Protein backbone atom coordinates (compact mmCIF):
# COMPACT_ATOMS: atom_id res chain seq x y z
CA UNK A 1 0.00 0.00 0.00
CA UNK A 2 1.08 3.58 -0.62
CA UNK A 3 1.02 6.33 1.97
CA UNK A 4 -1.31 9.32 1.74
CA UNK A 5 1.46 11.59 0.48
CA UNK A 6 1.11 9.72 -2.83
CA UNK A 7 -2.52 10.80 -3.20
CA UNK A 8 -3.74 13.70 -5.35
CA UNK A 9 -7.31 14.88 -4.84
CA UNK A 10 -9.15 15.78 -8.03
CA UNK A 11 -12.70 17.07 -7.45
CA UNK A 12 -13.15 14.88 -4.39
CA UNK A 13 -11.52 11.68 -5.68
CA UNK A 14 -8.13 10.62 -4.35
CA UNK A 15 -5.85 9.51 -7.19
CA UNK A 16 -2.63 7.61 -6.70
CA UNK A 17 0.40 9.47 -8.08
CA UNK A 18 2.26 6.62 -9.74
CA UNK A 19 3.71 5.39 -13.05
CA UNK A 20 2.39 2.42 -15.01
CA UNK A 21 5.38 0.27 -14.11
CA UNK A 22 5.24 1.12 -10.42
CA UNK A 23 1.55 0.32 -10.32
CA UNK A 24 1.79 -3.03 -12.10
CA UNK A 25 4.75 -4.02 -9.91
CA UNK A 26 2.71 -3.16 -6.81
CA UNK A 27 -0.22 -5.28 -7.99
CA UNK A 28 2.10 -8.22 -8.66
CA UNK A 29 3.49 -7.93 -5.14
CA UNK A 30 0.01 -7.68 -3.65
CA UNK A 31 -1.15 -10.72 -5.61
CA UNK A 32 1.81 -12.84 -4.55
CA UNK A 33 1.04 -11.96 -0.93
CA UNK A 34 -2.65 -12.87 -1.48
CA UNK A 35 -3.77 -9.41 -0.41
CA UNK A 36 -7.31 -8.19 -1.02
CA UNK A 37 -7.14 -5.15 -3.31
CA UNK A 38 -9.85 -3.05 -4.97
CA UNK A 39 -8.63 -1.16 -8.06
CA UNK A 40 -10.50 1.70 -9.76
CA UNK A 41 -9.24 3.16 -13.03
CA UNK A 42 -11.13 6.44 -13.06
CA UNK A 43 -11.83 8.90 -15.87
CA UNK A 44 -13.72 12.23 -15.84
CA UNK A 45 -17.07 10.43 -16.25
CA UNK A 46 -16.47 8.47 -13.06
CA UNK A 47 -15.41 11.62 -11.20
CA UNK A 48 -18.62 13.39 -12.27
CA UNK A 49 -20.76 10.37 -11.37
CA UNK A 50 -19.17 10.34 -7.92
CA UNK A 51 -19.99 14.04 -7.44
CA UNK A 52 -23.67 13.27 -8.05
CA UNK A 53 -23.81 10.12 -5.91
CA UNK A 54 -22.30 10.28 -2.42
CA UNK A 55 -22.50 6.51 -1.95
CA UNK A 56 -20.59 5.97 -5.18
CA UNK A 57 -18.00 8.57 -4.15
CA UNK A 58 -17.50 6.79 -0.84
CA UNK A 59 -17.03 3.47 -2.64
CA UNK A 60 -14.46 4.97 -5.02
CA UNK A 61 -12.50 6.54 -2.18
CA UNK A 62 -12.67 3.31 -0.17
CA UNK A 63 -10.83 1.49 -2.97
CA UNK A 64 -7.22 0.59 -2.28
CA UNK A 65 -6.00 2.16 -5.51
CA UNK A 66 -7.61 4.79 -7.75
CA UNK A 67 -5.51 5.59 -10.81
CA UNK A 68 -5.88 8.09 -13.65
CA UNK A 69 -7.42 6.37 -16.67
CA UNK A 70 -8.17 9.31 -18.94
CA UNK A 71 -6.19 12.24 -20.28
CA UNK A 72 -8.79 14.55 -18.70
CA UNK A 73 -7.62 13.50 -15.24
CA UNK A 74 -3.99 14.18 -16.16
CA UNK A 75 -4.83 17.60 -17.61
CA UNK A 76 -7.04 18.47 -14.66
CA UNK A 77 -4.29 17.58 -12.21
CA UNK A 78 -1.83 19.77 -14.12
CA UNK A 79 -4.23 22.74 -14.17
CA UNK A 80 -4.70 22.40 -10.41
CA UNK A 81 -0.90 22.26 -10.01
CA UNK A 82 -1.08 18.71 -8.67
CA UNK A 83 0.57 16.90 -11.58
CA UNK A 84 0.26 13.14 -11.97
CA UNK A 85 3.11 11.24 -13.70
CA UNK A 86 1.09 9.63 -16.51
CA UNK A 87 -2.10 7.84 -17.45
CA UNK A 88 -2.53 4.41 -15.93
CA UNK A 89 -5.20 2.85 -18.11
CA UNK A 90 -7.31 -0.10 -17.13
CA UNK A 91 -6.74 -1.81 -20.47
CA UNK A 92 -2.94 -1.55 -20.40
CA UNK A 93 -2.83 -2.61 -16.76
CA UNK A 94 -5.02 -5.60 -17.58
CA UNK A 95 -2.73 -6.63 -20.45
CA UNK A 96 0.35 -6.35 -18.23
CA UNK A 97 -1.29 -8.48 -15.55
CA UNK A 98 -2.42 -11.06 -18.12
CA UNK A 99 1.13 -11.44 -19.45
CA UNK A 100 2.46 -11.82 -15.92
CA UNK A 101 -0.32 -14.22 -14.95
CA UNK A 102 0.52 -16.34 -17.98
CA UNK A 103 4.16 -16.59 -16.89
CA UNK A 104 3.24 -17.38 -13.30
CA UNK A 105 0.31 -19.75 -14.01
CA UNK A 106 -2.12 -17.53 -12.10
CA UNK A 107 -5.87 -18.05 -11.73
CA UNK A 108 -8.10 -15.34 -13.22
CA UNK A 109 -11.85 -14.82 -13.18
CA UNK A 110 -13.49 -12.73 -15.91
CA UNK A 111 -16.89 -11.14 -15.33
CA UNK A 112 -18.76 -8.89 -17.72
CA UNK A 113 -19.58 -7.92 -21.32
CA UNK A 114 -22.20 -9.45 -23.63
CA UNK A 115 -22.56 -13.26 -23.85
CA UNK A 116 -20.96 -13.45 -27.30
CA UNK A 117 -18.05 -11.28 -26.16
CA UNK A 118 -17.48 -13.45 -23.09
CA UNK A 119 -17.51 -16.58 -25.25
CA UNK A 120 -14.99 -15.15 -27.71
CA UNK A 121 -12.88 -13.86 -24.82
CA UNK A 122 -12.60 -17.39 -23.42
CA UNK A 123 -11.11 -18.65 -26.70
CA UNK A 124 -8.84 -15.61 -26.97
CA UNK A 125 -7.42 -16.08 -23.47
CA UNK A 126 -6.79 -19.79 -24.05
CA UNK A 127 -5.02 -19.01 -27.32
CA UNK A 128 -2.97 -15.98 -26.24
CA UNK A 129 -2.32 -16.86 -22.60
CA UNK A 130 -2.35 -20.68 -22.52
CA UNK A 131 -0.78 -20.96 -19.05
CA UNK A 132 -3.42 -18.86 -17.33
CA UNK A 133 -5.85 -20.93 -15.30
CA UNK A 134 -9.31 -19.56 -16.09
CA UNK A 135 -11.18 -19.67 -12.80
CA UNK A 136 -14.35 -18.67 -14.63
CA UNK A 137 -15.81 -16.48 -17.37
CA UNK A 138 -19.31 -15.09 -16.99
CA UNK A 139 -21.05 -12.44 -19.07
CA UNK A 140 -22.52 -9.36 -17.44
CA UNK A 141 -26.16 -10.19 -18.21
CA UNK A 142 -27.12 -11.95 -15.01
CA UNK A 143 -30.14 -11.41 -12.76
CA UNK A 144 -28.88 -13.37 -9.76
CA UNK A 145 -25.23 -13.10 -8.80
CA UNK A 146 -25.28 -16.00 -6.29
CA UNK A 147 -23.77 -18.44 -8.81
CA UNK A 148 -20.99 -15.99 -9.64
CA UNK A 149 -20.28 -15.32 -5.98
CA UNK A 150 -20.09 -19.06 -5.21
CA UNK A 151 -17.80 -19.71 -8.19
CA UNK A 152 -15.42 -16.96 -7.11
CA UNK A 153 -15.50 -18.11 -3.51
CA UNK A 154 -14.75 -21.73 -4.43
CA UNK A 155 -12.05 -20.98 -7.02
CA UNK A 156 -10.32 -18.19 -5.05
CA UNK A 157 -8.77 -16.49 -8.11
CA UNK A 158 -5.59 -14.44 -7.97
CA UNK A 159 -7.16 -11.68 -10.08
CA UNK A 160 -10.78 -10.83 -10.83
CA UNK A 161 -11.48 -8.54 -13.79
CA UNK A 162 -14.97 -7.00 -13.65
CA UNK A 163 -16.21 -5.46 -16.90
CA UNK A 164 -19.71 -4.31 -15.96
CA UNK A 165 -19.14 -0.63 -16.70
CA UNK A 166 -19.31 2.08 -14.08
CA UNK A 167 -20.87 2.42 -11.55
CA UNK A 168 -22.14 -1.17 -11.57
CA UNK A 169 -18.69 -2.76 -11.47
CA UNK A 170 -17.56 -0.69 -8.49
CA UNK A 171 -20.75 -1.46 -6.56
CA UNK A 172 -20.32 -5.17 -7.34
CA UNK A 173 -16.70 -5.24 -6.19
CA UNK A 174 -17.43 -3.26 -3.06
CA UNK A 175 -20.23 -5.66 -2.11
CA UNK A 176 -18.41 -8.91 -2.81
CA UNK A 177 -14.67 -8.35 -2.41
CA UNK A 178 -14.74 -9.96 1.05
CA UNK A 179 -15.34 -13.42 -0.46
CA UNK A 180 -11.87 -13.74 -1.98
CA UNK A 181 -8.47 -12.22 -1.22
CA UNK A 182 -7.78 -11.28 -4.81
CA UNK A 183 -6.95 -8.29 -6.96
CA UNK A 184 -10.42 -6.96 -7.85
CA UNK A 185 -10.29 -4.56 -10.78
CA UNK A 186 -13.01 -2.79 -12.77
CA UNK A 187 -12.07 -2.71 -16.45
CA UNK A 188 -15.10 -1.19 -18.21
CA UNK A 189 -15.23 -2.13 -21.90
CA UNK A 190 -11.82 -3.81 -21.99
CA UNK A 191 -13.22 -7.27 -22.76
CA UNK A 192 -14.75 -5.95 -25.99
CA UNK A 193 -11.34 -4.74 -27.14
CA UNK A 194 -9.49 -7.87 -26.04
CA UNK A 195 -12.05 -10.11 -27.75
CA UNK A 196 -11.86 -8.07 -30.96
CA UNK A 197 -15.37 -6.57 -30.86
CA UNK A 198 -14.05 -3.03 -30.48
CA UNK A 199 -10.87 -1.40 -31.75
CA UNK A 200 -8.52 0.56 -29.56
CA UNK A 201 -7.12 3.78 -30.99
CA UNK A 202 -3.82 3.36 -32.87
CA UNK A 203 -0.63 4.45 -31.07
CA UNK A 204 -0.52 7.77 -32.96
CA UNK A 205 -3.93 8.77 -31.60
CA UNK A 206 -2.97 7.63 -28.10
CA UNK A 207 0.29 9.59 -28.09
CA UNK A 208 -1.49 12.76 -29.16
CA UNK A 209 -4.18 12.31 -26.50
CA UNK A 210 -6.89 11.82 -29.11
CA UNK A 211 -8.05 8.35 -28.11
CA UNK A 212 -11.37 9.83 -27.03
CA UNK A 213 -11.91 11.31 -30.53
CA UNK A 214 -11.04 8.02 -32.23
CA UNK A 215 -13.61 6.22 -30.06
CA UNK A 216 -16.18 8.86 -30.96
CA UNK A 217 -15.56 8.27 -34.67
CA UNK A 218 -15.96 4.53 -34.13
CA UNK A 219 -19.05 4.92 -31.93
CA UNK A 220 -20.92 8.19 -32.70
CA UNK A 221 -23.51 7.30 -30.06
CA UNK A 222 -20.87 8.09 -27.44
CA UNK A 223 -21.37 11.82 -28.09
CA UNK A 224 -23.69 12.15 -25.08
CA UNK A 225 -21.14 10.50 -22.80
CA UNK A 226 -18.41 12.71 -24.24
CA UNK A 227 -20.25 15.77 -22.97
CA UNK A 228 -18.93 14.85 -19.53
CA UNK A 229 -15.48 16.16 -20.48
CA UNK A 230 -16.39 19.87 -20.92
CA UNK A 231 -18.46 19.71 -17.72
CA UNK A 232 -15.50 18.21 -15.92
CA UNK A 233 -13.06 20.81 -17.27
CA UNK A 234 -15.43 23.62 -16.26
CA UNK A 235 -15.37 22.30 -12.69
CA UNK A 236 -11.57 22.06 -12.79
CA UNK A 237 -11.18 25.70 -13.85
CA UNK A 238 -13.80 26.78 -11.35
CA UNK A 239 -11.85 25.07 -8.57
CA UNK A 240 -8.61 26.64 -9.80
CA UNK A 241 -9.93 30.20 -9.81
CA UNK A 242 -11.85 29.88 -6.55
CA UNK A 243 -8.55 28.99 -4.89
CA UNK A 244 -7.04 32.32 -5.90
Question: Model features per residue range: what roles?
Answer:
Residues 36, 106, 180-182:
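A short helix->loop->beta-strand "cap" motif at the edges of active sites that frequently abuts
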Residues 74-151, 155:
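Conserved beta-alpha
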Residues 73-75, 168-169, 190-195:
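Short gly/pro/ser/thr-enriched loop/turn and capping motifs at secondary-structure boundaries
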Residues 140-143, 182-218:
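Short, flexible loop segments at boundaries between secondary-structure elements
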Amino acid sequence: MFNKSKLVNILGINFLSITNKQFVDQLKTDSNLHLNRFVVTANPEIVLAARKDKEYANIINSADYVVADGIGIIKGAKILKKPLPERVTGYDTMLSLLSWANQEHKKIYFLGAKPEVAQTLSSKIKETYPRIHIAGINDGYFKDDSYIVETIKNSNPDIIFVALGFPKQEFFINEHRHISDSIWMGVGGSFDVLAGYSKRAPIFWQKHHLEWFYRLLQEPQRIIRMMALPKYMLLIYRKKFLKK
